[in-house]
Amino acid sequence: MKMNKSLIVLCLSAGLLASAPGISLADVNYVPQNTSDAPAIPSAALQQLTWTPVDQSKTQTTQLATGGQQLNVPGISGPVAAYSVPANIGELTLTLTSEVNKQTSVFAPNVLILDQNMTPSAFFPSSYFTYQEPGVMSADRLEGVMRLTPALGQQKLYVLVFTTEKDLQQTTQLLDPAKAYAKGVGNSIPDIPDPVARHTTDGLLKLKVKTNSSSSVLVGPLFGSSAPAPVTVGNTAAPAVAAPAPAPVKKSEPMLNDTESYFNTAIKNAVAKGDVDKALKLLDEAERLGSTSARSTFISSVKGKG
């Protein structure tokens, strides 16, 4: 398959460019539609994949160990995830999340965008998907937002997610959940080490699709930005799309010993000071993060046995 580009121009809204903080030279030179660094994938191999339809109605979840597919192409390691996205609903915003597993490993995603003729149109390397700290309703993750503008006549776009041998040699520095929680509630940051996640061929991916109802003023051509830039892709004939695979359900995982100890101590201290509301909030957060002892610690503390 030739790696010729079908996208028309890379554009940025004036407001988006002005609001992008601290753009470095490397960020400015990043051009999503430059697919020369992406693996060369034969058309026949792409046609053999099952492309899971994703729309705005729900977030598509894929556990690569069970829902991934094999694509035996040089430059790609382990299973891949393949999605199809409607291209006739306006400008698209795709948010891809790769969740950290047990504070020890994470899948470093690369994304190749193809038009409806399976022609490579944009490439987002693993460096585009940056580490996001855990929050009240979110886990540690690698995440990136891609803005795509399908050309007129496009019916579908294709999103191929994979990792590489180079990515597997690298790691991601995480933030311990106890530190993240302490920062969020204004407590002192505990002096505990941050975990490091190795990159693996397995992981939990989440893809969310949105459309922008209001059009923005676009200027171009530009080189790019650290902020997501809309990429125009396009051609006309649409290939057939296979049925989606079912999405597995993620199980909650136990937290690390240091994190467990931090929350248990914080719960005991809150109860000792008579601040039961704070203790309950700590309990809820600890159990959300996978604690198996926070509830018993809370109960024993309230009973005066903590």
Swiss-Prot record:
Looking up InterPro entries in the UniProt record yields:
MalM (IPR010794)
* Alphabetically ordered keywords of this record: Periplasm, Signal, Sugar transport, Transport
Q: Where in the cell is it found?
A: Periplasm
GO cellular component, alphabetical, reads: outer membrane-bounded periplasmic space
- Entry superkingdom: Bacteria
Q: Entry's Pfam families?
A: MalM
According to its UniProt entry, one GO biological process term is: carbohydrate transport
Q: Which N-terminal residues, if any, form the signal peptide? A: 1-22
Stated role = Not yet known. Might function in the uptake of a still unidentified substrate.
UniProt family annotation: To S.typhimurium MalM.
Instruction: Supply the name of the protein.
Output: Maltose operon periplasmic protein
Species of origin reads Escherichia coli (strain K12)
Upper classification of the source organism reads: Bacteria, Pseudomonadati, Pseudomonadota, Gammaproteobacteria, Enterobacterales
